[in-house]
Amino acid sequence: MEEVPQKIDFAGEESKILKYWDDIKAFETSVKMSEGKPEYSFYDGPPFATGLPHYGHILAGTIKDTITRYAHQTGHHVERRFGWDCHGLPIEFEIDKLHGVRTKEDVLKMGIPTYNQHCRSIVMKYSHEWEIVVNRMGRWIDMKNNYKTMDTPFMESVWWVFQELFKKDLVYQGFKVMPYSIGCTTPLSNFEASSNYKDVSDPACVVSFQTLDDEKVSILAWTTTPWTLPSNLALTVNPKMEYIKINDIKRNQIFILGKNRTSILYKSDKEYTVLETMKGTDLIGKKYVPMFPYFASDANMGGFVVIGGDFVTDDSGTGIVHTAPAYGEDDFNVCIANGVISRDQFKRPILNSVDANGCFTSDVTDFAGMMVKDAETTKQISIYLKNKGRMVNSANLVHSYPYCWRSDTPLIYKAVGSWFVRVESIRDKLLANNDKTYWVPDFVKEKRFANWLKNATDWAVSRNRYWGTPIPLWISEDGEEVVVIGSIDELERLSGVRVTDLHRESIDHITIPSQKGKGTLRRIEDVFDCWFESGSMPYAQQHYPFENKDKFEKIFPAHFIAEGLDQTRGWFYTLLVLSTALFDKPPFQNLIVNGLVLAADGKKMSKRLKNYPDPMEVVSKVGADSLRLYLINSPVVRAETLKFQEKGVQDMIKDVFLPWFNAYRFFVQNCLRFEKATNTTFQPDIKVALASENVMDKWILASCQSLIAFVRAEMAAYRLYTVVPKLVRFIEDLTNWFVRLNRKRLKGSNGDADCLAALNILYEVLMTICIAMGPFTPFFTEYMYQNLKKALPKEKQMDSVHYVMFPEPIQEAFNTRIEEAISRMQVVIELGRAARDRRTKPIKFPLKEFMVITENQQYLADLESLKSYILEELNIQNIVLTSDEGSFVVVTAEADNKRLGARLKNDFKKISPLISKLTNEQLREFQKTQTIDILGHELTSEDLKIIRKYNGETTNSEPSGNEEILTVLDLTVDSALYEKGLARELINRVQRLRKKSGLTFDDPVSMFYHTKEAELKTAIENNNDYIKETILFNLQFSETTSPSNSFATEIVSIVKDNDAEIYFLKN
């Protein structure tokens, strides 16, 4: 092994590792090495390359990389292919902005070939930047052999998927009200529409509809979408609700509205008189005068009539709903049910009064060409209604309203002709297949996703757009003959034309002769919703079923996928719909859902606000490993939100990587020292490690096996949120406990044999944790491994730590008894440190006594066997271990009020005061049995928490404790203890200066100190042996200050006025 430098630049070392991986083709080699092993299939959800990767992408990528690296290290062959989403609105929207495209006419004027070529030119706009980020984060994935949704083989498989659904009668053409994006001039699926809500202020109007049979009577309706009033065809009441006819005293008008809805207009019932009370059924069939004249002739087709619908309630509005079937889902359904419209009336003008751009058509003469959601349009409609005497009341309402996820413009609901996949008919299968999958965290599957599936509606998969996979439907002019094409070969067979590209410009002109004498069949204009393409990814990335048929069928469904919580209604959903429709199987077996990464202020990360640091700038400062560990050691891996803090990433260096590095460096340093001192070569031998009788050796080795067993079990359950904290805690145990408590042994203070045993233990643990942490922190583990492996025989050395299989636990090294004992020792030491901190007694100053009180005899026996460590760590002279709780401890109980209140209801008030009166004897018995009866109610350890309090004086003592033990620190200080504290602080300053000067323990130097303080000089003389034993040098007193030939000198203040100068001279 080679010497390790004193300091490390983590980011700099990572850059060297990247070059090394590139040189040895590490990823490619690892995949090749694992050929023939059991397959572990993984699907990578395709991102768009039109935007730069952000922390959400980095998080998901890190989770994917960690799991797939672990799968490789546990003996699997893991194909990892990157994918790109290339089609759809995100691409088209960029082109529309770039070229000023607003309407369909603009596209046709430009020409679809030119428009699509523009789209193609930006699809991979940031692919290079993506590759840089993915590579820099240490993610191993094949970005060269990627899949793209715009590639012909992928698109051909999408055609096959659609044809299969058509064969199963799961495809139909319909007329349906859908969320519609004015900004992108296309309908959206329900899951797209639910992804971007904003609180907005909209007009809320009460308007009156004059009844046809009595011009003095008007029916009142309430709406927040006055732009839909020109398309009104019905008024809907609830047949079971009560309604009233009233005389408005101030307005001198007669209105009909819900009996319980008068508050929408009136503050007092003195403002009106009730003329008649009626049921909703009494109103059904009543006709009224159209509010606008544009579609008055629709009265002859069953329009402008009161109808019944159960969705009407009396908790808002007037209890009567203005119904425009073309612009509301409930409106559409209730009008269908009541025969006001039918599904085949695609071209009825009143159902098409708003064009594709969100503007009124020429039929709506007063507002033709006006954008329906513009404020000016609302104003003009309001003026019209007031002039006609139909505006009864108007106000503004703040409510949550859907916006287009891509153009960020308000959506409208609009009836459109579309091609649908039947989802409602396979809901039960979707739920059954969802039950076969395993999600982390489980609540997302059981609650959020399952609830979404229960209410899933038929999926509109067609988009009247241009850059996408064309829907392969060729239809006769009368719509009677429909041909669905499932492959390029089939298209050639039926049309006589062979194509190599499947985009619109390549196939729109192709016609198919009718086989039923209906002339020529032409392709419909629509393309697929891009979610249909990404949902087809398991099949299309393999060009299934045209290629890789056997391969696909062996690895489907995927073992693992991972994406963000937002994909619950996106990719996770479309994957499940298509796999269920095609094969009645779930598309994946295991899924990790990550939460959202927010800015430090809890707001969404925004380029405009610049409220987050650039990811690559963070990585350039502290390295990718720190960012990886920060992200996957946070609640975000269990679908919770993370407020990103750059300090949190930096803390990973301070709290994890630097201590880990220092432990590794300390090992190498002392290994090389041992080799030099013994003139031997260190060769790690697990037998030597296992033979060690040292309790700390047994503990760290046992802990290491427990860790490996735990990681294997939890990784099998995909619980990163339990695994990573455990790994980090182990590194703390290794660095802050094992290494620190065994420094002298590792330096050889107990002889060569003991030193060799300690070095073997430390090597074994460092190498094990190095391999185990490989999937999580791939750079630093590689850095360490490249040096640590040099101690191994050549045949056991691998080119990369990531080629080494994940460790198996060593069964004979397990020792839960020792693990428990050391854990108890740690608790006691931490309680003692906390007591020192509270009373401002630094650890450098010795204290007289420390008492531990517990009735648990095994606990005391464990501490007795380890008391030398406790004495040293707490810097105390004596430890007292006693089970005499009666003399020192007052025991009380504290109730879990929330738990007991919910369970005991009214009896809790009677029981609560009795809990506080329980005696020491009762509570000690409760501790043994874990149960106690109070007024007939059995209380357990989950209901009561035991509190131990010290009953002695606390002027010169400081108690601490938990549910098991109580500790008391004696704060009395005598002169001998005070002097030892001074000596200890001087040692600390000498060691710091030695480190600062770059000295090792073997360097030939002399150490001196000079002081005029008699108190300090006496303290040093009285503790000379202790000082020499610790620093391994004789610290000599000098009558004078440091001479000119001293190469390191420092004036230090030991305590208060006790100053000293320490310096080193070369021998």
UniProtKB/Swiss-Prot annotation:
Its main location: cytoplasm. Pfam families: Anticodon_1 (PF08264), DUF5915 (PF19302), tRNA-synt_1 (PF00133). GO terms for biological process: isoleucyl-tRNA aminoacylation. It is found in: Cytoplasm. The keyword Ligase applies. Its EC number is 6.1.1.5. It comes from Dictyostelium discoideum. A motif ('HIGH' region) lies at residues 47-57. Signal peptide: none annotated. Belongs to the class-I aminoacyl-tRNA synthetase family. It is an enzyme of class 6 (ligase). A motif ('KMSKS' region) lies at residues 604-608. CDD domains: Anticodon_Ia_Ile_ABEc, IleRS_core. Keywords: Aminoacyl-tRNA synthetase, ATP-binding, Cytoplasm, Ligase, Nucleotide-binding, Protein biosynthesis. One of its GO terms (cellular component) is cytosol. It catalyses: tRNA(Ile) + L-isoleucine + ATP = L-isoleucyl-tRNA(Ile) + AMP + diphosphate. GO terms for molecular function: aminoacyl-tRNA deacylase activity; ATP binding; isoleucine-tRNA ligase activity; tRNA binding. The keyword Cell cycle does not apply. ATP binds at residue 607. This is Probable isoleucine--tRNA ligase, cytoplasmic.
